[in-house]
Amino acid sequence: MRFDVNQLKWTREPAEYEISSDKIEIITKPHTDLWQRTYYHFRNDNAPVLQMETEEKFFSFTVKTEFESKHRFDQCGVVMYLDSENWLKGSIEYENERFQHLGSVVTNNGYSDWATTEIDAGIKSMWYRFSRREDDYCIECSEDGVTFKQMRICHMWNGGETIQFGIYACSPEDSSFKATFTNMEITECRWLAHDGQQPDEE
């Protein structure tokens, strides 16, 4: 399997974007977001998502993001969007001039779970690596594209068969910014099988 922009399909195609063989740019629209129910008690499902489809059970997808975010919750990153109630994403969400949230959201059966850590607001580029091992998934991040750090390991209840994965960008509040995606690559699964305690017998 290889990453081919000609295989990408939009869910909610944005008004402004450019796609070439090695770069994708998205201009976000205000009040676009992905979130389901938890804490905020709203259901937002209108962010543009650009993905390819696969039945491959073991692989990794890497992408570099660059962004001009400037307003609270502006974000772009890697995503696996199955439907409105089952998806996961990894991104940086801008907060203020001091810090932003590097984090991931896992949404299973209509409830979102957000895990974050604060990073400096001056960071305007981040690499992500999305890996699949059957119906388990891992998201990692890197500032240089070489050394990746684990952000999230999760199970997706509806992620065991054919999936869609790719990129997204959105501005949940009254804002707009440009998100740029480059260095998109699919490789063998870089998230290696666990080499410690053996699995329990089913």
Locations of the language-model features?
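Extracellular glycan-recognition regions
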Residues: 1-202
